[in-house]
Every structure is written in structure tokens, then in C-alpha cells.
């Protein structure tokens, strides 16, 4: 009985310490995020190409990609930058009802359609 009580006490202390550690500590270097501003929504994606800058002119990147480099380094990467601020809130679109399904999927399946 003594061993079981001692083991249960250890487990209880372990759970209490773990609970405290998870609820009262923060990750090192974590910063509270700013609220999302729809006017600043952007997506940056790598275009799988590298580029160089010589005499102030960059080598061509394909499509909508632009050459981005750090400081005065001549070598850079091609990225595509998409700005979502112009799209607005999709739930405020007047034609949002046209995008909704006309019939639920469960109804179609019960009728034998796929």
C-alpha cells in the first residue's frame, strides 16, 4: 500500500507540474501577433528560379515573378507577390448566394445520384 500511495503522489505532482508549465509559460521568442488587417494581406511564393543583378538590372524572372535580393548582394531569388487586399471580404459579395450549392449532397446520394 505504501508503494502505491507514493506512486500516485508522484503521478499527481508530475501532472500538476506539467499543467503549470503548459499554461503559465510562453515559448522563447514568441511575439503576440497583430490583428489581421485585410489591407495588408499578401502571399509570397518562390518561383523556383534564381536571378542576378548586374549594373542595376536584374536577370529576367518568368511570369509575374520579380527578382528579390538582400542588401547589395548580386544574387537573388524570383518570387511572386500576390496582394489580397483588393479582393475584400468574400462574405460581403452580392453574388455569394450563387456560389452556394442548390441541393445538399446527402439529398443527392439518397436519390441515387453521385
From Swiss-Prot:
Keyword Ion transport belongs to the record: no
Protein name: Evasin P1096
List of glycosylated residues: 50
Disulfide bonds: 47-65, 51-67, 61-78
GO CC terms, sorted: extracellular region
Signal peptide segment: 1-23
Keyword Secreted belongs to the record: yes
Organism, as annotated: Ixodes ricinus (Common tick)
Keyword list, A-Z: Disulfide bond, Glycoprotein, Secreted, Signal
Primary site of residence: secreted
Disordered: annotated segments: 89-114
Gene Ontology molecular functions: C-X-C chemokine binding
Subcellular location: Secreted
Ranges of Basic and acidic residues composition bias in the record: 99-114
Function: Salivary chemokine-binding protein which binds to host chemokine CXCL8.
